[in-house]
Amino acid sequence: MEPFTTFSLVASSLILLICWALVKANKPAKNLPPGPPKLPIIGNMHQLESQSPHRVLRKLSRKYGPIMHLQLGQVPTVVISTPRLVEEVVKHHDINFADRPTNTTSQIFYYNNQNVAWSSYGNYWRQIKKIVTLELLSVKKVRSFSSIRAEELTRAVKSVEPSVGSTINFRDLTSQTVNNMVSRATLGDVCKERHILLDTMNDILKTFNSFNVVNFFPSLQFLNVITGKKAKWLKIHKQLDHILENILEEHKSKPKGNQDDEDLIDVLLRVKDAGGQELPITNDNVKAITLEMLTAGTSSSSMTIEWAFCELMRHPEVMKKVQSDVRSAVKGNKVTEDDIQNMHYLKLVVKETLRLHGVPILVPRQNREDCNVLGYHIPAKTKILINAWACGTDPDTWEDPESFIPERFEKSSVSYFGTDFQLIPFGTGRRICPGVNFGIGTVEAVLSNFLYHFDWKLPDGVKPQDIDMTEVTGISTLPKYPLHIVPVSTVSQQK
């Protein structure tokens, strides 16, 4: 594109934004929720220039209130920051707030938002949510993958054994283990292009975690074109689509087996071929859901495992207690899924990790119609951000809220299934993540095996308080620096 043409487009867009800002400034506002002062054009965008926006939003909410209005570029936004306000939204406005705002990258990569997380609320979303919940990620189906988890964990344990006494990159270990478990459950054992697909997925996750001005100024869609971003995304999507199409063809050509042995693509293709759905299932639907299983199932689980180990290495007394819990529950020389059900303290550790280090801000919602929440006017098409981390660290709900204390759940019935609004790492209401059982099963299996088979210490000269807990926030949060720790002995060496 010629420089003059580019300059003209940018200049024209600036003029349009100024006109939009002037019109908006002169338009009388109804009783919106309180919020910080807004700058011309960008509104409150400058206040979210942080690696931890959930912390910034909590700080602002403590000043302006648990329901807070922000203007993020052209996008009116309401932030919900306490369990009581989340309950108000879910119990009285869940259907109205069940839609999703426009997201350019999700539209491209998920086949025009044909996945569960980003699909608009309606008949299609209800249909695929039901399929995913009842067919793909039911308790029975998740249990059917136990042999895959066991095989991959045996492989992971063997890979660590030669490194006993040496420092290892724990993030690499967990990412590889979880990727193998999730990809085998989704794609099956025989998938020629699995590793290429996983590499392409990393490109997608980087795209989702990167800043895109168009998400804040939807009228400037052309910027994605002139900057080359859209062409880059379409190229990645084309590569991805080719790989997924080949994988579907592999599955279609293999002999039909027992339903208990089906991977997730087998299940989707079986449902597609059976018909009887209100809206016929297409190949693009199958590919969008497959991609979602891979991206959502790998990144969030591996991050939770790394955060759990960061906390355990910072709290040796908790590490000692959870290892005792795990080892006393194991009846043989390997961890079984029946054993895990008896690891009560491990489950408290997982719950406390999710409270402090789960998804910090839930996938944005959007209301279809004007409504009132606690007397405040919420105009239609407002982006709704639920700060799950702020709910999990609400001082009116939790004692010593930012300390890692698994024992706080010992006599508590609070669960992470979305009905207790002070702990919502998987969301709540109609839009709750359907993969809770799958994700928790993965996290508990990996943690229990690494805690059972090895003792762990920090590298020489590193103290527990030296572990850097600085966050980097994208879809989830992860430690800014990968955890490096030393496996010092194995169970067999201790016996």
Curated annotation (Swiss-Prot):
Highest taxon above the source species: Eukaryota
Matching PROSITE patterns: CYTOCHROME_P450
Protein name (database record): Germacrene A acid 8-beta-hydroxylase
Topological category with respect to the lipid bilayer: Single-pass type II membrane protein
Pathway: Secondary metabolite biosynthesis; terpenoid biosynthesis
GO BP, sorted A to Z: response to jasmonic acid; sesquiterpene biosynthetic process; terpenoid biosynthetic process
Induction: Induced by short jasmonic acid (MeJA) exposure (48 hours), but repressed after a long exposure (120 hours).
Gene3D superfamilies (alphabetical): Cytochrome P450 (1.10.630.10)
Homology family: Belongs to the cytochrome P450 family.
Top enzyme category: oxidoreductase
Acetylation recorded as keyword: no
Transmembrane feature ranges: 3-23
UniProt-listed Enzyme Commission number(s): 1.14.14.168, 1.14.14.170
